[in-house]
Amino acid sequence: LSAGRMVGLSACLAGTLLQKADYSGKFFPNMPFYGVWWVAAVLLICVAVCAIFGAINGIVVSYLQVPAFIGTLGMQLIVYGVCLVYTNATPIGGYRAAYTEVAKGQLFGFIPYLFLIALAVGIVMWFVYNKMPHGKYMYAIGGNEQAAEVSGVNTKKTKIIIYITAAACYALGGFLVGAKSGGSSVNMGYGWELEAIAACTIGGVSVNGGIGRISGVLIGVLVFEILKTCLQYLGVDTNYQYIAQGIVIVVAIALDIRKYIAKK
C-alpha cells in the first residue's frame, strides 16, 4: 500500500535535483549539473532511497511478523511525511531538458523511450521470476509460505528482496512520471497502489498469491489504461471515472476470489 507514496517521493526527489539553473524556485541553487550522467545518478539516488524504505517494509513484515497490509499502510504514511518534510509541500517544476527528454523522447522518431523502458523492465522481471531461483521461491511463498519454509526456502530473505525490488520499480516509475509531467508534488502517485492491484488482478495475478505471470501483468496494465483513456475520450466526467475504476477493482478481485474458492 506504500507504492503510490514511494512514486511521489521519487518524483519529488528527482525533481529537486534536476531543476534548471535559472529556475526561480530552485530547491538547491548551487546544485551542479553534469549532463546525462547526472540524470542517471539521480535515478540511482531515487532507487536507493526507495529501496531503503522497501527493505524496512520487508523487515517489518518478515521479522516483526506485522501483517503486510498494516506494515505497508504505516509505511505509506511515513513516506508521505518524509516527502512533506523534504519539499515543505511545495510544488516542483522547472526541469532540465535532459531529464524530461527521458520520458518524452523517441527512438528513430517514433518509438517512445517510455515504451522501451517498460519493455526492458518487463523482460528483466520475466527472466527473474521464470528463470532464477528467486522467482520460484516467490511463487512458492505466495502459494503456501509454511510449505515453502519447510522445503528449505529462506522466506524472510526472499520477502525482503521482493519488497526491495518492488520499491526500486516504484522509484523508476516516479522518476519517469515526473519527467513526463514536467513537474511534481507530494500528491503525485496518490492512490496508484489501487490501480496497480486492479491491473495485476485483471492480468491474472491472484490476490491470494502464488498465481500470476509478468506477461499477464503487462496486459492488465494495458487494459486498465485503455479503459481510462476510453472514458476520457468519451467525455465521461472525472468523478464518474473514479466510480468506474472502483467498480473494475471490486469486480476483478471478486472474480479472482471466486476462482480461488472454486479451486479449493
Where are these regions (language model features)?
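Membrane-embedded helix boundary and interhelical linker motif in transport proteins
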Residues: 1-55, 108
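Transmembrane helix-bundle core of multi-pass membrane transporters
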Residues: 29-40, 64, 68-134, 158-161, ...
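Cytosolic-side transmembrane-helix boundaries in multi-pass membrane proteins
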Residues: 150-157, 227-264
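Short loop segments and helix-boundary regions at transmembrane helix junctions
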Residues: 1-2, 33, 49-94, 128-133, ...
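Short cytoplasmic-facing helical segments at TM-TM junctions of multi-pass membrane proteins
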Residues: 134-159
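Transmembrane alpha-helices
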Residues: 70, 154-178, 190, 194
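Transmembrane alpha-helical segments in multi-pass inner-membrane proteins
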Residues: 170, 180-245
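Hydrophobic core segments of alpha-helical transmembrane domains in multi-pass membrane transport
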Residues: 11-15, 46-50, 76-83, 115-127, ...
